[in-house]
């Protein structure tokens, strides 16, 4: 069940307007960051703020439409977007799910981070101000075909993406925290290719 939540969260698993400084940070990040790599933690909280799930891993993306998220603890899961298809590999189950990339992502955080820089096309943008010395931004997806109601993003003084929060219609909140962010690293094209392991069950297209 938790793994299902994890994959749904990702698909829901990467906007927005604040005061002038935050607008500049967001647009600068989207326009100038063609690729990135970071460690992350992902915490899922229920409507009462109780932790349901906590996982850690490494993410990479390269525009347009390529990304790789490796969930490492407490279990392994790999999510890859190769520009055309979305691959989800559950290591424990040796099971692969594959979908068309556009159908899998839509107006999602992953689409935002690894897609084009036309932010306003998929999101309604509003100001949420400054908290804990971070500029917070809110994005509400224009499409109704998403499993979340809004995304919050926070940038530090260096215009680095530090936190993302996803809120869904059940009151759940998923908090992604990024560390050791590297902007525009040279990433191997092999990172964004996926071949199902021998013997794996493949579901989908």
Q: Where do the model's predicted regions map?
A:
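Beta-strand elements of well-folded, non-transmembrane domains
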Residues: 44, 61-63, 159
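Positively charged n-region of N-terminal signal peptides that target proteins for export
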Residues: 1-4
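An acidic-aromatic
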Residues: 58-107, 174
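Amphipathic hydrophobic-ligand
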Residues: 52-58
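Flexible, processing/modification-adjacent segments and terminal tails
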Residues: 21-46, 50-52, 80, 89-149, ...
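Gly/Pro-enriched, hydrophobic low-complexity segments
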Residues: 121-126, 130-205
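Bacterial N-terminal signal peptides
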Residues: 7-16
């Amino acid at each position: 069940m938790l793994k299902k939540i994890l994959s749904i969260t990702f698909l829901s698993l990467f906007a927005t307007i604040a005061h002038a400084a935050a607008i500049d940070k967001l647009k600068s990040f989207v326009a100038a960051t063609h690729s990135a790599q970071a460690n992350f933690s992902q915490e899922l909280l229920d409507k009462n703020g109780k932790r349901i799930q906590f996982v850690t891993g490494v993410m990479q993306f390269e525009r347009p439409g390529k990304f790789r998220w490796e969930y490492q603890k407490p279990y392994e899961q790999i999510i890859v977007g190769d520009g055309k298809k979305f691959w989800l590999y559950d290591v424990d189950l040796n099971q692969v799910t594959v979908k068309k990339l556009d159908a899998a992502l839509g107006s999602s955080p992953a689409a935002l981070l690894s897609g084009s820089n036309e932010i306003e096309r998929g999101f309604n943008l509003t100001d949420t101000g400054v908290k804990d010395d971070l500029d917070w931004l809110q994005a509400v997806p224009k499409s109704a075909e998403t499993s979340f109601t809004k995304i919050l993003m926070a940038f530090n003084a260096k215009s680095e993406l530090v936190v993302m929060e996803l809120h869904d219609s059940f009151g759940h909140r998923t908090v992604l925290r990024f560390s050791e962010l590297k902007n525009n690293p040279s990433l191997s094209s092999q990172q964004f290719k996926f071949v199902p392991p021998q013997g794996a069950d493949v579901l989908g297209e």
